[in-house]
């Protein structure tokens, strides 16, 4: 009997064999990301960033974001407040784009299954880029960027041209169901 080949993006392995209480299971690290959207001539686009191949999620295409730092809480003890602050901070660090967390729409929250690998419990927000003229990547953590239609990003992933982690793929899939940016924002504004 042959063993199934593991897909290169399968970082979770056999999730049915583990639980949070197992020895060696690392606790999830709180994190946040912003799915930044803009109108385009045909439809709308999402900002994707390519991670440096030498760091966590190396070579993957992701949305701007990162872990929640203690200072992101400010005087608040609210995790969503801290997640929004982290998303603003990380987006500025990675792209040079300044955002206001009041413009964020809560989209989803992902926590990977238990395991020995580093894992992030991530808040996903969506926001419309208002007047963003340029993206200034840091050339350290981030090596490339692209504004792309969600359906085109999925097609590139399917062709093996870009790598996506499962939450990014699913987010792009949800977005690809909408033709216009106003429809995306309208739907998810009502859903939260």
Where would I find each of the regions flagged by the language model?
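N-terminal leader/linker segments that precede catalytic domains of diphosphate-processing enzymes
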Residues: 1-142, 146-192
């Amino acid at each position: 009997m042959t063993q199934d080949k593991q897909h290169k993006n399968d970082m979770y392995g056999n999730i049915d064999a583990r639980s949070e209480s197992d020895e060696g299971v690392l606790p999830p690290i709180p994190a946040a990301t912003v799915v930044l959207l803009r109108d385009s001539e045909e439809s709308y686009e999402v900002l994707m960033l390519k991670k440096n191949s030498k760091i966590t999620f190396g070579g993957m295409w992701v949305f701007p974001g990162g872990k929640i730092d203690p200072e992101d809480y400010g005087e608040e003890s609210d995790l969503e407040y801290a997640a929004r602050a982290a998303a603003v901070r990380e987006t500025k660090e990675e792209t040079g784009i300044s955002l206001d967390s009041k413009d964020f729409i809560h989209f989803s929250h992902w926590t990977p299954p238990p395991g020995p690998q580093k894992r992030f419990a991530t808040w996903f927000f969506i926001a419309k880029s208002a007047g963003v003229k340029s993206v200034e990547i840091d050339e350290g953590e981030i090596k490339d960027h692209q504004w792309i239609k969600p359906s085109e990003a999925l097609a590139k992933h399917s062709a093996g041209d870009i790598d996506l982690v499962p939450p990014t793929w699913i987010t792009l899939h949800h977005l690809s169901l909408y033709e216009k940016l106003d429809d995306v924002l309208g739907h998810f504004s009502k859903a939260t």
